[in-house]
């Protein structure tokens, strides 16, 4: 038998836009991140105690064009602001269909005791992502604000995503899980028609 679980990536902390792999130190900066570190640690201890191979999938922002609320469209319609260029952060994304395939592969693939970043190859700042989505949906680009200005317009949860900047390395996902991204970046993911999931499609 095997064990697989989903986790987050916020416990990497703010890395100033640097590339981060699974061996990086965990520096949780929020209560939510601390809870995720605790949960991931518990999974690892349980699996090792019983000799069960496990994979912990570290998952960034999930999007899904075929599901309600699964894209930035509603944020654009609400004119939700983003940060000015000098303060902007790198974000990480994964299409829901690619995530489903990663989950499948983590359960049927080679035995492993590891964490795996499950993210695409987008390499985009948040404003670039939102600007591209605006072009796709033929909406206005989001307004830009400084960190001080934007605090009055966003929830604490939304603000927390703008306080950390990092780019996740996905080499382990491609080599250890063997996942070939169907949607390599959000450019394909937001514009292509979703295809039915089948386990044999890596």
Predicted regions and their residues:
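Glycine-rich "substrate-gating" loop/helix at the edge of Rossmann-like oxidoreductase active sites
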Residues: 28-33, 60-66, 85-94
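A conserved pocket-lining segment of Rossmann-fold NAD(P)-dependent short-chain dehydrogenase/reductase
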Residues: 74-94, 98
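Mid/C-terminal beta-alpha module of Rossmann-like enzyme folds, strongest
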Residues: 100-158
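Conserved C-terminal active-site "lid" loop/helix of NAD(P)H-dependent oxidoreductases
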Residues: 131, 151-180
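Conserved Rossmann-fold NAD(P)-dependent oxidoreductase catalytic core, especially the SDR/UDP-sugar
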Residues: 1-31
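Amphipathic terminal alpha-helices
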Residues: 184-202
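Active-site Tyr-X1-5-Lys
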Residues: 27-55
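Glycine/proline-rich active-site loop of Rossmann-fold NAD(P)-dependent oxidoreductases
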Residues: 37, 50-52, 62-74, 79, ...
């Amino acid at each position: 038998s095997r064990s697989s679980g989903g986790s987050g990536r916020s416990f990497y902390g703010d890395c100033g836009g640097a590339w981060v792999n699974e061996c990086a130190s965990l520096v949780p900066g929020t209560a939510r991140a601390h809870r995720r570190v605790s949960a991931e640690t518990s999974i690892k201890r349980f699996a090792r105690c019983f000799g069960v191979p496990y994979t912990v999938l570290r998952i960034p922002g999930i999007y899904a064009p075929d599901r309600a609320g699964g894209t930035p469209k509603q944020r654009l319609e609400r004119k939700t602001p983003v940060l000015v260029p000098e303060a902007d952060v790198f974000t990480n994304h994964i299409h829901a269909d690619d995530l489903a395939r990663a989950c499948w592969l983590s359960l049927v693939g080679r035995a492993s005791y590891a964490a795996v970043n499950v993210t695409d190859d987008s390499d985009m700042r948040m404003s670039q992502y939102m600007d591209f989505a605006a072009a796709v949906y033929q909406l206005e680009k989001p307004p830009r604000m400084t960190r001080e200005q934007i605090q009055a317009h966003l929830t604490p949860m939304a603000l927390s995503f703008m306080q950390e900047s990092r780019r996740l390395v996905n080499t382990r996902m491609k080599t250890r899980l063997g996942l070939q991204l169907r949607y390599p970046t959000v450019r394909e993911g937001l514009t292509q028609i979703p295809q039915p999931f089948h386990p044999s499609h890596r």
